[in-house]
């Protein structure tokens, strides 16, 4: 696709060693217009900001054109069963995926739903259990999405009780596997880490789409945004071959790297974190003031009023 116009930098965790390797690759080919940092992304450069920008557009366009040649519809049979609405299962997923806290309470989660034809094809793909569990499309996604999403079956309309039981089983296995992943990689460190909660941040739902989960609507939206990006990247990769992520030990190092965790901006929780408050008469002065008060205490707000 690129020939000698770019240099290829092998995967190295972000930091001085990666910068040093990038310089080494550049010096070996000083005429290149950019560098592809494997599993990270692409950089372009030039004598001016405009030249650098135009080279980026060119390099990205070449990649898009290459992917376009392989573009085609994913062969997924339409779902013949009547399915439950996303709004019916969202509260179930919110409740089941709420991590326990040391005080015996739980960290309530907000869920946001996404679906497109591409997402539906992805979650209904025959090899979903392979490509969706391969790892993040770029390393730092892991702090928002966890190493892997939770996969749950399509929820049949009127049969949410057995569906919920199946989700509970899959969630228990997800947590068990996350704890094993942590234990395996933590024991090799000189300074052990403290385990994060083992709950998923992305849930793939057969027949419907995906949910992003987080302690706030913002965090849930970021998880969902990254999951959508993952769907697009993996779908494109699978048209050319098979998607591959970084190794599991590299995923762990990134997830538990203090500099990455600092991006989350953790702060002391507020009383209504993870709760949704519906306020009637929300368009009036009292309603809006009430909304502001609850929002100040961490709640996500739904304003309701009569349109007249």
Residue ranges and their predicted role:
Residues 305-306:
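Conserved acidic E/D residue at the C-terminus of a beta-strand in Rossmann-like folds
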Residues 270-301:
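Canonical Rossmann dinucleotide-binding motif of NAD(H)/NADP(H)-dependent dehydrogenases/reductases
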Residues 1-277, 289:
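Glycine-rich flexible loops
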């Amino acid at each position: 696709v690129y020939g000698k116009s770019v240099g290829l930098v092998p995967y190295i965790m972000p930091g001085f060693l990666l910068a040093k390797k990038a310089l080494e690759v550049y010096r070996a080919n000083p005429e290149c217009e950019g560098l592809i940092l494997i599993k990270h992304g692409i950089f372009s450069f030039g004598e001016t900001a405009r030249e650098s920008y135009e080279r980026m557009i060119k390099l990205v366009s070449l990649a898009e054109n290459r992917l376009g040649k392989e573009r085609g519809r994913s062969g997924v049979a339409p779902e013949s069963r009547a399915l439950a609405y996303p709004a019916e299962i969202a509260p179930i997923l919110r409740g089941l995926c709420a991590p326990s806290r040391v005080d015996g309470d739980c960290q309530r989660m907000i869920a946001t739903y996404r679906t497109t034809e591409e997402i539906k094809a992805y979650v209904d793909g025959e090899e979903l259990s392979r490509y969706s569990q391969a790892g993040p499309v770029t390393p730092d996604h892991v702090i928002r999405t966890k190493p892997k999403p939770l996969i749950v079956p399509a929820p049949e309309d009127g049969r949410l009780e057995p569906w919920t039981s199946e989700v509970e089983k899959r969630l228990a296995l997800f947590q068990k596997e996350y704890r094993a992943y942590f234990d395996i990689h933590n024991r090799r460190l000189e300074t052990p880490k403290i385990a994060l909660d083992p709950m998923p941040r992305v849930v793939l739902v057969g027949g419907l789409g995906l949910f992003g989960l987080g302690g706030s609507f913002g965090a849930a939206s970021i998880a969902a945004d990254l999951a959508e990006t993952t769907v697009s990247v993996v779908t494109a990769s699978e048209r050319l071959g098979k998607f591959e992520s970084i190794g599991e030990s590299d995923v762990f190092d990134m997830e538990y790297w203090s500099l990455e965790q600092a991006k989350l901006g953790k702060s002391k929780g507020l009383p209504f974190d993870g709760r949704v408050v519906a306020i009637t008469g929300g368009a009036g002065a009292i309603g809006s003031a009430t909304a502001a008060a609850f929002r100040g205490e961490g709640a996500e707000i739904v304003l309701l009023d009569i349109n007249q």
